[in-house]
């Protein structure tokens, strides 16, 4: 690289992997000039047992993060943790030994973690003749042909003599450039939140607690408030280093964060930093799982319920692999959708990759990609769920949103969708615009909020509303309507107040229901009930008009008209509200016409008597029994039409 070449920090991680003693650390020292073995035991043994991190300057001027992972079988866990976040793998294979057990294991891990770019460094070429080197190349090429790394460039090198190092750097530069556009897309996801799986935590005198890891999803900046899971430790970023001090780090970069906050010194590898309420942990998740069997062991099937170690990010949790109902044991090489049930919570989101190790002895047996980070505890897989997982696996965001909505019984918010599928709100909004436009998703509005529902699901909710109202009207045929709460509880027991209001409003717009005041009703059933009451009102008024002032008691009216008690009660309430009848006793009412006639008779009698009349005179004018006359006269007193003067001998006069 030219001395005047401008250096550009590139959010790409290059990771060196391979069998123990194949020269990874020596190669990294040849590439960078630094020994990645940071522990005394590593330098003494001559092999990497912990993760080594550094930086690498490429010929184009790009500076990338560099990870050296352990090659020995005993340090498989450290290898998996180090491989998390690698974008470009450098597979180190000795030209003397060729492909070895940990070579295979490391390639499998890289595949399971979603790595797609690889360069093979064929090391120790100074110790092998041309024929041996060629055979080693053929061995590597043949092995990789059955993986996603088929056709990966193979570069013979010697860390001791420097042969091939420049060529390896040039090929690495090309591979890093191939990742560059994807990295830019990753950085530009403005609605994502950062996550940092912690792989180291240590204290620096004068600075305090420092954690390191590979940053995922979104940038992090000095001053950001973060939380660690599963400990729920809250902290603030006081300083950031990425190949030096910087105010902001990008996803895909190796970062060191200087943290302040209670409990930060107790943080350790396996925890994940993120923004509170923007990431979570789970005890159950769905994943696409590939079963590899145990390297070097006799092939055997994997049974449902097998206890395993699950590794994701830098965390490791014991759990069980559960197959779907009726599925047979898995054969080596098979891939299927499984549910993973964990014994402790694991910070995870859809799209993450997980590696699965056998419980004992601890060996790599498989892994894959997380489809849903939270799921119900069931081994039954509905057809709609299969469609959801197919869409998620293929990266079809609109298809995943559509399929997930089809599984929901009630309308939801865009935030609900984003949280369930671990998507950014911008991604969800873009998908919803297309789905709403094509009619497969309907938008409902309640207050200032929008709710979304699959069109078929919404039709089913409207059918439930119609059936509910029909049943409620049938059970109470005289009721003209019901409270929204009662209707919603019967039609959609799980709906909250906002969702219920939106569904009832949708029902009103479709003519499924109607609402008036505080009541919701079936416009047809309610009309029938109202008609029964209205007809009863007309018959009651007609009878009372005909009876005049000598009206029968209300129970007698109901008996004469053969009205049931409920209809009679509702009709009398309606008539009283409309002032079509006037009660003069507890169980006696006059029609409005009869009561007006009584006023005329009483007024005429009082005027004829010179302005005041006795009860006897007024009873005679009314032409009814003394008891009924007293009831009518007391009613007229109560409504302030007349006034009784007890001191004047019980005379009544007009007010």
Question: Model-flagged regions — what are they?
Answer:
Residues 2-69:
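Conserved G1/Walker A P-loop phosphate-binding module
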Residues 6, 125, 142-295:
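Conserved catalytic-core segments of large NTP-driven translation/proteostasis enzymes
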Residues 21, 27, 46, 66-68, ...:
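Residue-level signature of catalytic and energy-coupling elements of molecular machines
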Residues 69-74, 84-106, 111, 115-135:
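Conserved Switch II/interswitch segment of TRAFAC-class P-loop GTPases
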Residues 72-73, 96-100, 115, 124-129, ...:
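Conserved nucleotide-binding/hydrolysis micro-motifs of P-loop NTPases
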Residues 94-95, 118-134, 155-163, 260, ...:
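G-domain G4 guanine-recognition motif of GTPases
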Residues 128-133, 142, 243-244, 262-583, ...:
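C-terminal effector modules of nucleic-acid-centric enzymes and ribosome-associated factors
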């Amino acid at each position: 690289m030219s001395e005047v070449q401008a250096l550009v920090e590139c959010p790409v991680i290059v990771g060196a992997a391979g069998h123990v003693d194949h020269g990874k650390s020596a190669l990294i020292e040849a590439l960078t000039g630094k020994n990645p073995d940071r522990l005394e035991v590593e330098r003494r043994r001559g092999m990497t047992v912990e993760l080594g991190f550094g930086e690498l300057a490429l010929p184009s001027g790009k500076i990338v993060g560099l990870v050296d992972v352990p090659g020995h079988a005993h340090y498989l866990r450290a290898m998996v943790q180090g491989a998390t976040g690698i974008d470009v793998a450098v597979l180190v294979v000795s030209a003397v030994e060729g492909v070895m057990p940990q070579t295979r294991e490391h390639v499998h891990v890289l595949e399971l973690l979603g790595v797609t770019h690889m360069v093979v460094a064929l090391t120790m070429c100074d110790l092998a003749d041309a024929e041996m080197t060629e055979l080693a190349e053929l061995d590597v090429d043949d092995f990789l042909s059955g993986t996603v790394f088929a056709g990966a460039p193979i570069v013979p090198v010697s860390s001791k003599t420097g042969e091939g190092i420049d060529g390896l750097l040039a090929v690495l530069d090309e591979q890093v450039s191939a990742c560059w556009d994807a990295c830019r897309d990753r950085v530009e996801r403005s609605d994502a939140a950062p996550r940092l799986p912690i792989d180291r935590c240590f204290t620096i005198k004068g600075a305090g607690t420092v954690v390191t890891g590979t940053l995922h999803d979104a940038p992090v900046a000095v001053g950001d408030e973060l939380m660690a899971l599963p400990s729920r430790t809250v902290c603030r970023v006081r300083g950031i280093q990425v190949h030096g001090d910087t105010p902001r780090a990008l996803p895909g970069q190796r970062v060191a964060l200087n943290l302040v906050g209670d409990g930060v010194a107790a943080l350790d590898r396996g925890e994940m930093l993120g923004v509170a309420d923007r990431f979570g942990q789970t005890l159950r998740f769905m994943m696409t799982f590939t079963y590899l069997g145990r390297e070097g062991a006799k092939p055997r099937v994997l049974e449902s319920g097998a206890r395993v170690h699950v590794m994701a990010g830098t965390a490791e949790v014991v759990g069980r692999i559960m197959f779907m109902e009726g599925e047979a044991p898995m054969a080596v090489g098979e891939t299927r959708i499984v549910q993973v049930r964990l014994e402790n919570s694991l910070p995870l989101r859809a799209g993450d990759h997980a590696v699965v190790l056998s419980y004992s002895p601890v060996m790599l047996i498989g892994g894959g990609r997380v489809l849903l980070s939270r799921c119900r505890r069931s081994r039954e897989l509905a057809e709609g769920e299969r469609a959801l997982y197919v869409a998620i696996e293929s990266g079809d965001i609109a298809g995943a949103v559509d399929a997930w909505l089809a599984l929901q019984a009630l309308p939801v918010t865009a935030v609900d969708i984003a949280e369930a599928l671990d998507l950014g709100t911008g991604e969800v909004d873009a998908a919803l615009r297309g789905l709403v436009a094509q009619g497969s998703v309907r938008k409902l509005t309640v207050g200032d909020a929008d709710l979304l529902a699959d069109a078929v699901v919404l039709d089913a909710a409207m059918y439930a509303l119609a059936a509910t109202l029909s049943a409620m009207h049938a059970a109470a045929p005289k009721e003209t309507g019901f409270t929204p709460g009662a209707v919603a509880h019967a039609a959609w027991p799980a709906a909250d107040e906002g969702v219920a209001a939106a569904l009832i409003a949708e029902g009103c717009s479709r003519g499924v229901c109607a609402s008036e005041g505080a009541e919701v009703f079936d416009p047809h059933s309610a009309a029938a009930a109202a008609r029964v009451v209205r007809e009863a009102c007309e018959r009651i008024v007609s009878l009372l008009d005909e009876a005049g002032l000598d009206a029968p008691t209300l129970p007698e009216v109901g008996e004469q008209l053969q009205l049931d008690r409920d209809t009679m009660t509702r009709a009398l309430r309606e008539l009283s509200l409309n002032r079509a009848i006037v009660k003069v006793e507890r169980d006696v009412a006059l029609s409005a016409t009869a009561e007006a006639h009584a006023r005329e008779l009483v007024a005429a009698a009082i005027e004829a008597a010179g302005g005041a009349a006795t009860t006897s005179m007024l009873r005679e004018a009314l032409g009814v029994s003394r008891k009924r006359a007293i009831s009518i006269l007391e009613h007229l007193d109560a409504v302030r039409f007349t006034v009784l003067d007890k001191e004047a001998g019980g005379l009544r006069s007009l007010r």
